[in-house]
Amino acid sequence: MVIMTEIVDIDKKYVENSLKQKMNVLKDNRFLMDDVFIPIAKALKIEVEEVIEIFAKKLDFASCYELHAYAEQAKMGCLGRKVDIDLGLCWLSDFFGLIKKEEADLIRKKVVESYLLYKKPYKEALEEGRQMIIKLLKEE
């Protein structure tokens, strides 16, 4: 019985140390702090430390190291959703069918690229998208 207790204690210690290591990896990454953890903490109205702990508990080590790539994908995906809403693409394409899905996808992609890759101000990139939509809608 003593051996089983020791094994359980070793397992608990391993889990605790593993969690601490993952927390340190995540905390030390300035990009993740600024672009992932702080915004999520603000959105959920919880402490940044709590967000980091959630990530550390839910992810394995490999996923912790890959978070930067996931964050970049998330940034583009979330921005695409914002563009959809700001330009009404979901209405015009998905519900009313006034613009083909492929055209809406292209407009969204161009706005996101202009903003993220070419560093245009969001409103300017959005205006370009708006002009593309108007042109498509007025075509006969």
From Swiss-Prot:
It holds the Pfam family DUF1959. This is Uncharacterized protein MJ0517. It comes from Methanocaldococcus jannaschii (strain ATCC 43067 / DSM 2661 / JAL-1 / JCM 10045 / NBRC 100440).
